[in-house]
Amino acid sequence: MRNFRSCATLKRIGITLGDCAGIGPEIVDLALKSARLPDSADYIVVGKYPDCSLGKPTLETARAAAAALEEAVTRARRDELDAVVTGPVHKAQMYQAGFKFPGQTEFFAERCGVKNFAMCLTGGKITVALVTTHIPLNEVSGALKQDEIVRVGQLLVDFLRCRSYESPRIAVAGLNPHAGESGKLGREEIEIIEPAVAELQSAIRNPQSAIEGPLSPDTVFHRAAEGEFDAVLCMYHDQGLIPLKLHAFHEGVNVTLGLPFPRTSPDHGTAFEIAGKGVARADSMIAAINLAVELAKKRKRA
């Protein structure tokens, strides 16, 4: 692993390994040995991890992963870290170990006292943000609210501007097939999404920015990948994650919007079945670290 002397010019990037029985330790090690990380950061592995059998998660490995998250968020809130990158965890094991959150996104938001947050994923030419996240598909329609679409859309605009998109172009995906076909295939577009898009358009101060939608979900991601849009605002979890992973499976990054510090993670799981076999790829972890460094450099402190 590379070690850098801490100084004022280096951004301090805390990295958790996730569940140490998975590929987390392996991909972090590969990433820190890679020439694809900038030298403008100090990379700090956070947490204490037990000896374990690779591929065999236990409650002990889950508790260690949870404790590492607690340490990382505490140090970031104390301004001891400029950004946090989290390794993959096994949610079922985490729940058994007492973890009370749907995912790491919700954990960081609660620990930071943040209500206005969102899940965003980026990879290749596609960036998506999710209006609803970890809920059953049959609850999505009831959970969609105009103010939530506007709230997440504004966070997405801020994120894109932070990444130097001065005039972001955002597509808003419809919920139903063909964006509802003028109400024939569902009323959510007419009653919820269209008013939210209009409100977003009026809230964006830069007239060169574009908020367009609701657009048919079956073509909007192709249009984004072709460069027509900088991001897609999605109504539910798999609407955004399926095209992103199809387009950029090995480079996808999860980033939590709205936190007081950058938090990213690779967009994949623990992969217990290949842990320790020397076949795990670190591309997504490398991308997550690079994005954390980029955002840390642009971070505005209160």
Task: Show which residues each predicted segment covers.
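Short, hydrophobic/aromatic-rich beta-strand segments within well-structured domains
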Residues: 118-120, 234
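Ligand-binding beta-strand-loop-alpha-helix segment within the catalytic cores
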Residues: 121-151
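Conserved hydrophobic/aromatic beta-strand scaffold that supports enzyme active sites
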Residues: 107, 119, 128-130, 263
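Contiguous, glycine/small-aliphatic-enriched amphipathic segments in soluble metabolic enzymes
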Residues: 1-105, 145-201, 208-235, 239-264, ...
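A generic structural signal for well-ordered coil/turn residues at beta-strand boundaries
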Residues: 116, 124-127, 249, 268
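Residues that scaffold the ATP/ADP-binding catalytic core of kinase and kinase-like folds
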Residues: 97, 111, 140
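A glycine-rich helix N-cap at a beta->alpha junction
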Residues: 105-115
